[in-house]
Amino acid sequence: MGMTIAEKILAAHAGKKEVTPGEIINAKVDIVLANDITAPIAIKEFEKLGVKDVFDRERIALVPDHFTPQKDIKAAEQCKMLREFAQKYKIKHYFEIGRVGIEHALLPEEGIVLPGDLVIGADSHTCTYGALGAFATGVGSTDAAIAMATGECWFKVPETIKFIYYGKLQKWVSGKDLILYTIGDIGVDGASYMAMEFIGEVIDNMPMSGRFSMCNMAIEAGAKAGIIVPDKITEEYVKLRAKRPYKIYNSDQDAKYFEIKEYDCSRIPPVVACPHLPSNVKPANELSHIKIDQVVIGSCTNGRLEDLREAAMVLKGRKVHPEVRMIIIPATQKIYMQALKEGLIEIFIDAQAVVSPPTCGPCLGGHMGILAKGERAIATTNRNFVGRMGHPESEVYLSNPAVAAASGVLGRIGTPEELGL
């Protein structure tokens, strides 16, 4: 029996010829990641182990992105702990303010995660890296601590669901819409502890930005990982960034899948996930009665250059509604710089949006755009649980960047078509 790409990567890193779903394995990891919320816990657990050094100072990434620039004393102390740990153990991939970006945009951009890698991160959206053809999954801080010491972690081999996307995308529909639509179909537990493998002609023609968005939100369906078999688009992205060898894996034709689902993308419009679950999905054009107070365009889901370009196409020559606050967050410094060079930042400021430095910020209700009681936001982020962006009685709607930008101009949820685009 053949294996899926997820099974092949796990088998290779466990030193086995094959693995089967449900099997418990111990495997060598390529990268261990933690941020300013999860790393302090991992560091404390690491110090308890009494080891003299980390397993590999070039295979650990510490990214203080959630509350950067540090929003208060506690956040500053947590970042100080990361900084001191990185200095003590000479961690190569520690990203200070000025170099820092949102971790799941930053690591691929820097060539730290590559195809065929086995990656664990003390952050649930570590699954983003599946877009590169890596098996990447979130773990707890204790597992991250052990891996920083040993370079290994335990895994339960997941079943895999294959998702096939075909047809022609409608205008203003992106990878964000496809993953929201998929989660709306299968539910927030529809892929619990499984790998979601995305394939089909639509995926074949999708840029890396859309692939990152889709794999990023696999966890919102309960998945252990989202993954896409690498192709020419992947290799074009990776070859400019890779500083070490990597290996391409694919799925065998006779691989066994838990389920196979197919979607005709020509029938999928721009969609919005309504409060308070990413699965509460409705067509954007059915929500024109929903007034909004805030727009957030950014995050590890949609803060890449292509996302900013999409938002700028909608905002160019227009103004944000006077009763709406629009916050735009480039995911990394390099993205910010390129957006400056392309004139995107000027478009945003002319539209009366505010541009933030790279940070997770409002996505997790941290800072830089917290909602008050009764307020509503439409955001390109990945979660809209109760209280996610602020007050428990606030609401968050999830969309792609074009819909978010159009909504900011209209003062209510709407689409670019309503602006004549």
Swiss-Prot record:
Pathway membership, UniProt: Amino-acid biosynthesis; L-leucine biosynthesis; L-leucine from 3-methyl-2-oxobutanoate: step 2/4
Database matches in Pfam families: Aconitase
Annotated catalysed reactions: (2R,3S)-3-isopropylmalate = (2S)-2-isopropylmalate
CDD domains assigned to the protein according to its UniProt record, in alphabetical order: IPMI
Alphabetical UniProt keywords: 4Fe-4S, Amino-acid biosynthesis, Branched-chain amino acid biosynthesis, Iron, Iron-sulfur, Leucine biosynthesis, Lyase, Metal-binding
Binding site for [4Fe-4S] cluster: 300, 360, 363
Cross-referenced Gene3D superfamilies: Aconitase, domain 3 (3.30.499.10)
InterPro entries, sorted: Acnase/IPM_dHydase_lsu_aba_1/3, Acoase/IPM_deHydtase_lsu_aba, Aconitase_4Fe-4S_BS, Aconitase_4Fe-4S_dom, HAcnase/IPMdehydase_lsu_prok, Homoacnase/IPMdehydase_lsu, IPM_dehydratase_rel_enz, IPMI_cat
Superkingdom of this protein's organism: Bacteria
UniProt-listed Enzyme Commission number(s): 4.2.1.33
Free-text cofactor note: Binds 1 [4Fe-4S] cluster per subunit.
Cofactor: [4Fe-4S] cluster
An individual GO BP term: L-leucine biosynthetic process
Gene Ontology molecular-function annotations: 3-isopropylmalate dehydratase activity; 4 iron, 4 sulfur cluster binding; metal ion binding
EC class name: lyase
Role: Catalyzes the isomerization between 2-isopropylmalate and 3-isopropylmalate, via the formation of 2-isopropylmaleate.
Family affiliation: Belongs to the aconitase/IPM isomerase family. LeuC type 2 subfamily.
Subunit structure: Heterodimer of LeuC and LeuD.
PANTHER family membership: 3-ISOPROPYLMALATE DEHYDRATASE LARGE SUBUNIT 2, HOMOACONITASE, MITOCHONDRIAL-RELATED
HAMAP family reported in the protein's UniProt record: LeuC_type2
This protein's name: 3-isopropylmalate dehydratase large subunit
Protein source organism: Thermodesulfovibrio yellowstonii (strain ATCC 51303 / DSM 11347 / YP87)
Gene name per UniProt: leuC
